[in-house]
Amino acid sequence: MSIRYESVENLLTLIKDKKIKPSDVVKDIYDAIEETDPTIKSFLALDKENAIKKAQELDELQAKDQMDGKLFGIPMGIKDNIITNGLETTCASKMLEGFVPIYESTVMEKLHNENAVLIGKLNMDEFAMGGSTETSISKKTVNPFDHKAVPGGSSGGSAAAVAAGLVPFSLGSDTGGSIRQPAAYCGVVGMKPTYGRVSRFGLVAFASSLDQIGPLTRNVKDNAIVLEAISGADANDSTSAPVDDVDFTSEIGKDIKGLKVALPKEYLGEGVADDVKEAVQNAVETLKSLGAVVEEVSLPNTKFGIPSYYVIASSEASSNLSRFDGIRYGYHSKEAHSLEELYKMSRSEGFGKEVKRRIFLGTFALSSGYYDAYYKKSQKVRTLIKNDFDKVFENYDVVVGPTAPTTAFNLGEEIDDPLTMYANDLLTTPVNLAGLPGISVPCGQSNGRPIGLQFIGKPFDEKTLYRVAYQYETQYNLHDVYEKL
C-alpha cells in the first residue's frame, strides 16, 4: 500500500521507527494531490512551501530522537472555515476571497503543538451552508467513489480528500450533520464531538449554539487519536467545556458484550431508502453477534428536527454574518456610491444564493411578530428533542441508525431544490440540537456508493462511541477499497 493510504497510527510507527522521514510522507502526499486532486477538486489552497519546511525541521528532530507530539510528522487538511494564520481562509465564498488571517485558531495551535503538518485548506459549501459542497464559489468537489456523485457537505472537501488518500486526516465542522453526512457519502469515519468538547475559537461562525469542529479519518482509531489532540477547554471560547478526560483510545479494543444499543423506529421510517435500511439492519445483526443488546425505542420528535434546526441555524447565521459589511474585511463593492449602497451591494454581490436564502429566513424568524411563532417555538422543540434523547439514555448506552437517509445523490440533482436538500439532514440535525456526540462509520455500499452507520452517545461519552464503532469496524470496513478508487 502506498504511503498515501497508510493510517495515522501506522505512519506514526513508521516515523518513530525511522523507517520513513516526515519529509518523505509530505512529498508523497503532494505527489498524490498533484495526481488526483485535479479530478476530485478537494483542495482550495495548498501550503506547500511551509509544509516542506516544517517536515524538514521534523526530519532533524527525528534524527535526534526528539519526536514529541501525538501527530509528529502527520499531514493534515483543514476545512476552509477554520482560521489558519498566514494562509488564506475564504469559507469558499466571494465575500472572503483574499482574506489572510493574522491569528491562529485554537485547534490549529493544538495541531501545530502536536507537530502535525498542514498540507492545505479544503473545499466546503459556502460558509458551511449546504449539503453537497456545490455552493462553493470556487469549485465542485466530486465523490471519490463515484465522480458523478456529490461528496456531501458542508465538509465535502474534508471527506473526499481523506477517502482519496490525499491526507490521512482532516478537520471539518458540523452544524447539522456537516461532518457525518459527507463521511457517510465518502465512506470514511467522521466524528461530531459533544458541543463544547472542542474549542470553536477561530471557527468562522455559522450557528454558534450548534457548530462543532471534529475529525475525519479512514479508520476509527485514527479518529480517536486526532480528537485527543484537539480536545480541551479554551479560555478563548466561553462555550468550551471544562472536561479533563480527553482519553479516547484506552477502551478501543474492549468488547461490547452487554452494551445496550437503542434503535429508534423513526430512524428506519419514512424517507429512508430501502438500501440504507437493509445495510443498517445488517449492521444491527453484526452488533448483536458481537454481544451488544439492541432494542427498538422511539424518539418521537425526530420529525421536527429539520424545521426547528433550519429556523435556529438560519437565525443565528443572520446575526453572525452581519459582520461581513464590506467595511472592515472581506468583499468590498466597487459600484457603491453611498454607505448604505456599500452595505447592500457588498453583501448582495459577496454572498451566494444559499447563504442569502438562510439570512433572509433567519431575519424573518427573528422579526417582530414572528419571533414567538418561529424562533421561540423552535427552541421549545429543541428542548423536546433533547428530552427524548435523555429519556433513552437512562436505559441505553448508545443510539444507532443511518447517518443519512440515502446514499450520495448526483451532482446537480438537488442544488435547485432546497427542501429536498434539507431533507438529507433528517437523522443528523437532532444530534446537534441536543448537543450530543455522533460518529459515522461505513456500513455498506449500494451501486458503488457508500452507506453510513451513525452511533450517537451521551454527552462527553465519545469514548463509548469509539469503542462500539471500532468493534463494528473489525467486521465491516472499506480499508481495501480506498486504494482501488
Swiss-Prot record:
SS bond list: none
State the Gene3D superfamilies in the record.
Answer: Amidase signature (AS) domain (3.90.1300.10)
Offer one Pfam family short name for this entry. Amidase
Catalysis: reaction(s): L-glutamyl-tRNA(Gln) + L-glutamine + ATP + H2O = L-glutaminyl-tRNA(Gln) + L-glutamate + ADP + phosphate + H(+)
Q: Does the keyword Translocase apply?
A: no
Q: Which UniProt keywords apply?
A: ATP-binding, Ligase, Nucleotide-binding, Protein biosynthesis
Enzyme Commission number(s) of this protein: 6.3.5.7
Catalytic residues per the record? K79 (charge relay system), S154 (charge relay system), S178 (acyl-ester intermediate)
GO BP of this protein = translation
Establish whether keyword Membrane is in the entry.
no
One GO cellular-component annotation of the UniProt record comes to: glutamyl-tRNA(Gln) amidotransferase complex
Q: Which GO terms describe its molecular function?
A: ATP binding; glutaminyl-tRNA synthase (glutamine-hydrolyzing) activity
Describe its function.
Allows the formation of correctly charged Gln-tRNA(Gln) through the transamidation of misacylated Glu-tRNA(Gln) in organisms which lack glutaminyl-tRNA synthetase. The reaction takes place in the presence of glutamine and ATP through an activated gamma-phospho-Glu-tRNA(Gln).
Note the subunit structure.
Heterotrimer of A, B and C subunits.
Q: Which family does it belong to?
A: Belongs to the amidase family. GatA subfamily.
The protein in question is named: Glutamyl-tRNA(Gln) amidotransferase subunit A
The gene it comes from is gatA
